[in-house]
A protein has these predicted regions:
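N-terminal hydrophobic targeting signals that begin at the initiator methionine
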Residues: 1-2
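Jelly-roll (double-stranded beta-helix
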Residues: 5-143, 150-208
Length: 208
């Protein structure tokens, strides 16, 4: 091939490559929402439930050993250190208090149900805006207390949202649901469960 013609072809290819680069977006394409993370922090089994309408009482303690001592003295209390604070969670009647603790919230009334054995479970959960769980169900009820961000819960009954510093009581056993981070900042929340201990704590589900 003629050297001049070869040089011309190289020049045309170079111009076309510059044109193609100019068509590329100037900023990266937005990534998919991050992962919704769920961590187990405490659990305890019960043979039976306390009488009367039940609430989750949430309290802060100065030190973890104090909260653990209080939890050891109560069959329906659990202690955990989450998000830089020490927490005591107690399932019981409304209006109670634990010596040495500072009450943060009472969440309820919690839906109750019959079971051969019960499991109290506390999860720490959350994620960036747009993150969500798969559709699932539990053999019991769950309640939420939001530390930061906004939690959303989608069920066949609709969508409920709760902001930081507020609580939300979920539905009873076997309700299909999807939980998501619905705000503009990362979700950080505590999730309190009353479950049938003889069944899997969570199973896949679907919306009909």
């Amino acid at each position: 091939m003629n050297p001049r013609r070869l040089d011309a072809w190289y020049f045309i290819a170079w111009v076309l490559s510059l044109f193609a680069m100019a068509l590329l977006p100037s900023s990266p394409v937005a990534a998919e929402p991050g992962q919704f993370i769920v961590s187990l922090v405490a659990e305890k089994k019960l043979n039976g439930l306390p009488p009367g309408p039940l609430y989750w009482r949430i309290e802060n303690f100065p030190a973890l050993d104090q909260a653990q001592s209080a939890a050891a003295a109560s069959p329906t209390s659990l202690a955990a250190a989450v998000s830089g604070k020490v927490w005591l969670f107690t399932l019981g009647q409304k209006g109670g208090a634990t010596p040495g603790g500072t009450k943060v919230a009472e969440v309820g009334p919690v839906p109750v149900f019959a079971a051969p054995e019960y499991l109290l479970r506390i999860n720490h959960a959350g994620g960036p805006p747009g993150s969500k769980t798969p559709v699932h169900s539990h053999p019991g009820s769950e309640s939420f207390y939001v530390l930061a961000g906004q939690v959303g819960q989608r069920t066949p009954h609709g969508v409920n949202r709760t902001e930081a510093g507020q609580s939300m009581v979920g539905h009873g056993p076997d309700m299909p649901m999807e939980v998501f981070s619905g705000g503009t900042t990362d979700l950080d929340q505590l999730v309190m469960f009353l479950l049938d201990a003889t069944r899997p704590a969570s199973v896949p589900a679907k919306f009909e």
